[in-house]
Amino acid sequence: MMASERNQSSTPTFILLGFSEYPEIQVPLFLVFLFVYTVTVVGNLGMIIIIRLNSKLHTIMCFFLSHLSLTDFCFSTVVTPKLLENLVVEYRTISFSGCIMQFCFACIFGVTETFMLAAMAYDRFVAVCKPLLYTTIMSQKLCALLVAGSYTWGIVCSLILTYFLLDLSFCESTFINNFICDHSVIVSASYSDPYISQRLCFIIAIFNEVSSLIIILTSYMLIFTTIMKMRSASGRQKTFSTCASHLTAITIFHGTILFLYCVPNPKTSSLIVTVASVFYTVAIPMLNPLIYSLRNKDINNMFEKLVVTKLIYH
């Protein structure tokens, strides 16, 4: 009998410890996370709606941005509601199937965002370094392929890692020292040998980070070279400002994900990993629409119009 069959027959249950060691701050944390999740939902769905409604925003960059917002919304929705529930209930349990599903979908959207940001970096490279060929290179077909490829690779990575998690064995009741069903804490809760699953996760994480960062760093090295060749200071500043939002987003995202998923032994610093997980899963999906909208006048103007219209008719 395979381990996955034993798991299904014994129906293991995971107990998410999360912030159970700090009961005095659970209510404040609930309110904070509820506010953050509300901002995340409104910000990302609002971004998608605004881009669809405003014809001025039917650009290639906004096409990628709308999919980035969709990815952030889906990722946050997979994780945050369960986190909020566990802050107010006495028994912080999640079924084995529920835990695996949470990891599976979180992995899909996490990997998708990694390569979506890389595709956006390539878009900025073409816009700055090859402006006359921009519409030719960044064709509708190529943009669709870049987005579809990001989603597809996210699904492939998730299915591989999920398959090997299903091959592990767990006790009927297992404690997980985190607030989400992350790969590292799931394998640490298994009593079977997780070596293959751990190595695969490490290899996939390294491959995803290195390959996406190569695209991003190469793109921005060429962008900076082009900017420095410009004679006009105002031209350099204007060109750089078009990349500032994306630079901020990738710095926050990749800095956090490198720390979380490229550390061979996260057990040695579980508290730090938990804090970083909170930032990665809760804060980043909220920050992305704020980062991009603050520097885009068309998005700001459209948002103001929607708010004014809402206030007038309600």
From Swiss-Prot:
SUPFAM superfamilies with a match to the protein in the record: Family A G protein-coupled receptor-like
Main localization, broad class: membrane
Gene Ontology terms: cellular component: plasma membrane
Stretches in topological domain Cytoplasmic: 49-56, 123-141, 220-239, 295-314
Gene3D superfamilies the record matches: Rhodopsin 7-helix transmembrane proteins
InterPro entries named among the record's database cross-references: GPCR_Rhodpsn (IPR000276), GPCR_Rhodpsn_7TM (IPR017452), Olfact_rcpt (IPR000725)
Sites carrying sugar chains: 7
Alphabetical UniProt keywords: Cell membrane, G-protein coupled receptor, Glycoprotein, Membrane, Olfaction, Receptor, Sensory transduction, Transducer, Transmembrane, Transmembrane helix
Extracellular compartment residues: 1-27, 78-101, 163-198, 261-273
Gene Ontology biological process: G protein-coupled receptor signaling pathway; sensory perception of smell
GO molecular function: G protein-coupled receptor activity; odorant binding; olfactory receptor activity
Known function: Odorant receptor.
Homology family: Belongs to the G-protein coupled receptor 1 family.
Listed name of the protein: Olfactory receptor 5D13
Organism of provenance: Homo sapiens (Human)
